[in-house]
């Protein structure tokens, strides 16, 4: 009975120490060649990692081993896969066009299908969260336009593409992270 009670208590966050709670909320950046060095922190309950740098060719195998070392096999593995210049795993997933290019050449339905296909590649590698899409508006002359990191200038149209990308990722089993707003691009009043 005491053993069973300890087991129940260890899975209940209300019974966790502040250190354990904080570690589960941490997302640490790891360069592709440093996956082994993070293993001790993962064993102690680090909540997740964000992949940076050039990924090793055996990334899926390394991530599976890393996840297996996590308490309860719980490790959030994230990558930043917006497309264009912000894409960390190109060597393993292939290139994704910029959001600007997607907005020019695809419908929202095609965007969702593309994100689903790309999300399946991420999932196969062991990536469960994509730090994309960018929700900022494409504003002529801004970084979002220059770097191709936004779909559209019109808020409603942009929102359709952002939602389609997120739905595609999520259908593939990868969590999407809508980001940057109120943002660095042109934004509308988010309170309306």
Regions found by a protein language model. Give the residues of each.
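Extended, charged catalytic domains and RNA/DNA-binding interfaces, predominantly
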Residues: 170-175, 179
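Enzymes and membrane/adaptor proteins characterized by extended Gly/Ser/Thr/Asp/Glu-rich
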Residues: 39-63, 67-158, 180, 185-192
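Boundary/entry segment of secreted carbohydrate-active catalytic domains
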Residues: 1-37
């Amino acid at each position: 009975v005491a053993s069973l009670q300890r087991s129940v208590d260890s899975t209940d966050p209300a019974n966790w120490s502040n250190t354990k709670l904080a570690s589960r909320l941490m997302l640490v950046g790891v360069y592709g060649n440093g996956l082994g060095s993070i293993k001790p922190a993962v064993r102690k309950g680090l909540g997740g990692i964000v992949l940076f740098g050039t990924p090793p060719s055996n990334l899926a195998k390394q991530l599976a081993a890393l996840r297996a070392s996590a308490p309860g096999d719980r490790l959030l593995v994230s990558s930043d896969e917006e497309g264009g210049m912000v894409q960390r795993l190109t060597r393993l997933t292939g290139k994704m066009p910029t959001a600007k290019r997607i907005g020019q050449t695809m419908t929202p339905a095609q965007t969702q299908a593309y994100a689903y296909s790309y999300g399946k590649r991420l999932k196969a590698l062991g990536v469960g969260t994509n730090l994309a899409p960018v929700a900022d508006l494409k504003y002529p002359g801004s970084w979002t336009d220059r770097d191709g990191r936004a779909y559209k200038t019109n808020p409603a149209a942009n929102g359709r593409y952002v939602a389609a990308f997120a739905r595609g990722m999520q259908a593939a089993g990868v969590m999407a992270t809508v980001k940057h707003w109120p943002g660095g691009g042109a934004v509308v009043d988010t309170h309306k």
